[in-house]
Regions:
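Short helix/turn-capping signatures at newly exposed starts of structured segments
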Residues: 1-147, 154, 159, 164-202
């Protein structure tokens, strides 16, 4: 029997402030980004997960840093910063045979929750950024695939609050995330949307 879950690590106003400060940087400058993350008190991933707080946790996602809240952040100078804050997944003895998020510091999981709860967590973070930045430049929804990408174009970067397939599960599960994406990086990834491509090149 498949058990449905949604896990979340909240994005509060303080974290939004921190992310918007990072969005002012050149995300292709790995040294500057790393220095700002150290100033923010975001330890390196290996340092954090090697500490006592994670001693009894199962495998956690690989990243470059961990926020004080518990988010796993990837920012390695390629023009992006990726911060997942919610996961939608099943525990059925296949890919997962236990609820891995229940014991991860900063995260809570809800058994029996599914898309309405997952979408609500995403909408909450969208609203937090809307409160700071105003209405988004794009709000792209793909109902067939249950995805939504909301984006704001800033001077140097784009802020995206997105949801979609989670790559570490071979797209079996989904995540909701904040993505900072450089408008100048040559090899920065694009969402599968002409509107998103137009956003970045306009």
């Amino acid at each position: 029997v498949s058990e449905e879950y949604v896990a979340v690590c909240p994005v509060d106003e303080e974290l939004v402030d921190r992310l918007l400060a990072l969005a002012e940087l050149d995300l292709t400058d790995a040294e500057s980004v790393a220095a700002r993350l150290r100033e923010a008190g975001w330890p390196d991933w290996s340092e954090a997960v090697g500490g006592p707080a994670y001693e009894d946790t199962p495998d956690v996602p690989e990243a470059t840093h961990v926020t004080p809240h518990g988010h796993f952040v990837t920012a390695d100078g390629d023009g992006t910063l990726h911060l997942p804050f919610a996961y939608l997944y099943t525990v059925d003895g296949g890919l997962l045979d236990e609820d891995i998020w229940a014991g991860v510091p900063g995260w809570t999981s809800q058994e029996g929750a599914w898309r309405p709860e997952f979408d609500a967590h995403h909408a909450t973070v969208v609203q937090r950024f809307t409160d700071r930045l105003g209405l988004p430049h794009h709000d792209i929804r793909q109902p067939r695939f249950h995805t939504r990408y909301v984006s704001w174009r800033l001077e140097h970067n784009v802020v995206i609050v997105g949801q979609g397939p989670e790559p570490m599960s071979y797209d079996q599960f989904e995540d909701a995330h904040v993505l900072l994406l450089s408008r100048t990086a040559q090899d920065a990834p694009f969402s599968d949307s002409e509107a998103m491509r137009a956003l970045l090149t306009s």
